[in-house]
Structure formats: structure tokens, C-alpha cells
From Swiss-Prot:
Record: residues binding substrate: 15, 42, 109, 132, 187, 292, 388
Xref: InterPro entries: Aminotransferase_I/II_large, DapL/ALD1, PyrdxlP-dep_Trfase, PyrdxlP-dep_Trfase_major, PyrdxlP-dep_Trfase_small
Self-association state and partner proteins as the record states: Homodimer.
Descriptive protein name: LL-diaminopimelate aminotransferase
GO molecular function, one term: pyridoxal phosphate binding
Protein encoded by which gene: dapL
One of the GO BP terms on file: lysine biosynthetic process via diaminopimelate, diaminopimelate-aminotransferase pathway
Pfam assignment, any one: Aminotran_1_2
Family that this chain belongs to: Belongs to the class-I pyridoxal-phosphate-dependent aminotransferase family. LL-diaminopimelate aminotransferase subfamily.
Top-level taxon of origin: Bacteria
Length: 408
């Protein structure tokens, strides 16, 4: 009989969001007439930008002609999209990232997991706590951690707590760590990091020859001009950081699928014989072997994000969701809740009242008023006592959900 990858057996019983879906389904089956408002998973709700729809429609028409048909595209992404990304997302901000350093993919979730393919298993790893579960689970699946402990953490991982006491900014590790996961604007807390604080992480990585895996999936929601959109705005970051970006949240591509990862050609790692190895060729080879590229039609849609009309329409989407976040934060604060985030990110991070646990508060909101959020403990041990609400929903649902919560 075939042997299984036993690392999967170390995973906690259920991934956070399927567990939420399971509880919601059970409640719905017992309460057929329940009107449930879901502010849990970070999935967008508004239609795609018109510019993207038109671009994809045109591309689809091209595919229906002999001259315009496209088969397999370059695994790294079409050059015209990579050049637009380089120009608008990086060069415009003073970041010298070339189009060749940009790899188009079908999602940051995939890339942040797949990047481990080119990194050795003996690297020490640090994650914030709470944290996007994929960072931890992908390391568990690939044998980079020890067994799980009773408190839900894993042996072999360094956990960096983020909470009210440190303004949701992690402290630098006390010892040398090889791989550092950072996400700003942060999921789940909605916290941000300024250039001075981010520079401390870059300096740490340079000093310790560490690699920062920087998730900037929510950078488009930044409202404060003093908050960096990319880690490459920090001097030296091209020598120590990989950045993940996505069109999912800013352009509503969660169901379309397009993202990109930046692998600077400066980045190096070590072989077992202490030979310096460039990371860019390794990732290029990995993608060429395991990935067939994003479809031509989708990449044309992503390209339209950078058109004049596309930029206006994307800004409209971002403004809409951020107004939702503002409404949620103001109403909850006025009702006496301690609320964080929501200013430069589409997530609201609530301190759970009455010393309830995160999951107890989840069940309380679901059963009392039919509102679904995400228990903070699902993001890690330090998330216990907190609760995440997402601004990704219709205005009417957001207003309705807030009225239900504050009138319990």
C-alpha cells in the first residue's frame, strides 16, 4: 500500500475557514429561515471593474480567431503585464524592480506556499501570532516543523506575538531566524507598519542573512501616505526580501485568479557546501516545471487594472470597502467595543467582550443575530480573545450587521 505524507497528520483537525463553514451550515440547517450575514472570509462581493471586463471580453474574442488565438503562454507571465506591474507598482514608488523580477501567478496563497519548493527544509522560521494560517500549514505539510503542541502551536517555529501591548507590531526575534513571514497591512489584525519600523526588519535580515517573505496583498487599501506599499521602498530590501502581491482584493479577482511574486535577482541562498546560489533561477525553474502560467484572457484583465479607467474603477472599489470598514469601526467603537484596524486595511480586529473566548463569541453572534465573523484564535494562540470582521460585503449588509451586533 502506498505511504502517505505523514506531515499532513500533524495538521490541526480543520483549516479555519472550512470549520467556520461547517458551523454555519449546521446552524442554517437547524434554522431554515435564518438571514445570515457573512463578514468572515475575506472574499470580495462587488462586480469586477468594467475596464477589466471589457479587456477580458476583447481577449476572449481574439481567442476565437485564427490570428488571435493563444495557446500556452510564458510561465512567468506575458511581458506586457509584467512591464505594467513594474512601472505602476514599483518604479512609480522609487523601487527599482524590473519586469524580469516579476512572476505572474494564479494567487498569492499558492505562491506563499510554493516558495518553499526552492528553500531548504532546515531553515529556521518565524511567523507572527496571530497569522494567516497558510504560512504555518504549508510549513507543516512540507516537514519544516515538529509536532503540534496542546496549545495549537508547532515545535520548531518561532512565534512573534502581535497584540495591544506592542501596537500589533512584532518584536525582532531574539535569536537568528532564517525565514521571516511578514504581512502588512496585516491579515488578520489590520495593523500597518511604517518605514522606520520596516527598516528594522530589513536591517535584521541583512545582518543575519535572513530572507523576508513579505505579503503585501492588501497594500492597495493603504490610506496613509507615510505607510510603505512595498518592502522595496526600504533600502537593502532587494537583497533580503521576496514580495507577494495579488489582484484579488483590489480588483476583485478572487474568482478570476491573478497575482504576482517579486524575486529580485540580488537574492541569494546557500547550498549545503556553503556555495552562494541565486534564488531567481531556482524560482524560474520551479515555475517552468510546475506551473503552466495564467491564461491570456485573465492577464489582459489584470493589465486593464493599470489603464486610466481601470485605476479609477479600482479606486472606487477600494473606497467602497474602506467606507464599509469605517462604518463598522465607528459603530462598534460607539457601542463600547475595543476595535483595531480598519484604517488602512479592510479588516476590523475586535477585542471580544466579557472575557468570552473567540469561538464562544463566534457562536454567540451566529446564534443571537446571524452574523458570521472569524475567531481570532483561528489565526493563532495570541489571537484568542479577538475577533475579525471583514469589510468585504454590500453596504446594506454591513449596516444591517452592525445594527444587529450593537443592539444585542
Amino acid at each position: 500500500m502506498v505511504q502517505v505524507n505523514e506531515n499532513y497528520l500533524k495538521l490541526k483537525a480543520g483549516y479555519l475557514f472550512p470549520e467556520i463553514a461547517k458551523r454555519v451550515k449546521a446552524y442554517s440547517q437547524s434554522n431554515k429561515s435564518a438571514d445570515i450575514i457573512k463578514l468572515g472570509i475575506g472574499d470580495v462581493t462587488e462586480p469586477l471593474p468594467r475596464a477589466c471586463i471589457e479587456a477580458m471580453g476583447k481577449a476572449l474574442d481574439e481567442m476565437g480567431t485564427t490570428d488571435g488565438f493563444k495557446g500556452y503562454g510564458p510561465e512567468q507571465g506575458y511581458s506586457w503585464l509584467r512591464e505594467k506591474i513594474s512601472e505602476h507598482d514599483f518604479i512609480s514608488r522609487g523601487c527599482q524592480i524590473s519586469s524580469e523580477e516579476i512572476f505572474v501567478s494564479d494567487g498569492s496563497k499558492c505562491d506563499s506556499s510554493n516558495i518553499l519548493d526552492i528553500l531548504g527544509k532546515d531553515n529556521s522560521i518565524a511567523v507572527t501570532d496571530p497569522v494567516y494560517p497558510v504560512y504555518v500549514d504549508s510549513n507543516v505539510m512540507t516537514g519544516r516543523t515538529g509536532d503540534s503542541l496542546e496549545n495549537g502551536t508547532y515545535k520548531g517555529l518561532t512565534y512573534l506575538a502581535i497584540n495591544e501591548d506592542n501596537n500589533f507590531l512584532p518584536e525582532l526575534p531574539e535569536k537568528k531566524v532564517d525565514i521571516l513571514y511578514l504581512c502588512f497591512p496585516n491579515n488578520p489584525t489590520g495593523a500597518t507598519i511604517n518605514k522606520a519600523d520596516l527598516k528594522k526588519w530589513v536591517d535584521y535580515a541583512l545582518q543575519n542573512k535572513s530572507l523576508i517573505l513579505f505579503d503585501a496583498a492588501y497594500e492597495a487599501f493603504i490610506q496613509d501616505d507615510n505607510i510603505p506599499h512595498s518592502i522595496y521602498e526600504i533600502e537593502g530590501a532587494k537583497d533580503c526580501a521576496i514580495e507577494f502581491r495579488s489582484f484579488s482584493k483590489n480588483a476583485g479577482f478572487t474568482g478570476v485568479r491573478c497575482a504576482f511574486t517579486v524575486i529580485p535577482k540580488n537574492l541569494k541562498g546557500l547550498s549545503s557546501t556553503n556555495e552562494e546560489i541565486d534564488l531567481w533561477p531556482l524560482w524560474n525553474r520551479r515555475q517552468s516545471t510546475k506551473f503552466n502560467g495564467v491564461s491570456y484572457v485573465v492577464q489582459r484583465g489584470a493589465e486593464a487594472v493599470y489603464s486610466l479607467e481601470g485605476k479609477k474603477q479600482v479606486k472606487g472599489l477600494i473606497d467602497f470597502y474602506m467606507e464599509n470598514a469605517k462604518i463598522m469601526k465607528n459603530k462598534l467603537q460607539n457601542a463600547g467595543y475595543k476595535v483595531y484596524g480598519g484604517d488602512n486595511a479592510p479588516y476590523i480586529w475586535i477585542k471580544v467582550p466579557d472575557q468570552m473566548s473567540s469561538w464562544d463569541f463566534f457562536d454567540f453572534l451566529l446564534q443571537k443575530v446571524g452574523v458570521v465573523g472569524t475567531p481570532g484564535s483561528g489565526f493563532g494562540l495570541a489571537g484568542e480573545g479577538y475577533f475579525r470582521l471583514s469589510a468585504f460585503n454590500s453596504r446594506s449588509n454591513v449596516l444591517d450587521a452592525m445594527e444587529r451586533i450593537i443592539n444585542i
